[in-house]
Amino acid sequence: NAAVAGAVIEGATLTFEVLQ
């Protein structure tokens, strides 16, 4: 659902930021 998709996007964004 939308909440899960939002959480996945947030997690991916956080991971991307950490890896920069």
Curated annotation (Swiss-Prot):
Family: Belongs to the actinoporin family. Sea anemone subfamily.
Annotated region described as N-terminal region, given as residue ranges: 11-20
Domain comment in the entry: Composed of a long N-terminal alpha-helix and a core region rich in beta-sheet structures. Before the pore formation, the alpha-helix binds the lipid membrane, partitions into the lipid-water interface and stabilizes the monomeric molecule on the membrane. Finally, it traverses the bilayer, thus forming the transmembrane pore.
Compartments where located: Secreted; Nematocyst; Target cell membrane
Keywords: Cytolysis, Ion transport, Membrane, Nematocyst, Secreted, Target cell membrane, Target membrane, Toxin, Transmembrane, Transport
Annotated segments matching region Plays an important role in the hemolytic activity: 3-12
Name this protein carries in UniProt: Cytolysin tenebrosin-A
Role this protein plays: Pore-forming protein that forms cations-selective hydrophilic pores of around 1 nm and causes cardiac stimulation and cytolysis. Pore formation is a multi-step process that involves specific recognition of membrane sphingomyelin (but neither cholesterol nor phosphatidylcholine) using aromatic rich region and adjacent phosphocholine (POC) binding site, firm binding to the membrane (mainly driven by hydrophobic interactions) accompanied by the transfer of the N-terminal region to the lipid-water interface and finally pore formation after oligomerization of monomers.
Gene Ontology CC annotations of this record: extracellular region; membrane; nematocyst; other organism cell membrane
Gene Ontology MF annotations: toxin activity
UniProt keyword annotation of Ribosomal protein present: no
A single BP term in Gene Ontology: killing of cells of another organism
Record note on quaternary structure: Octamer or nonamer in membranes. Monomer in the soluble state.
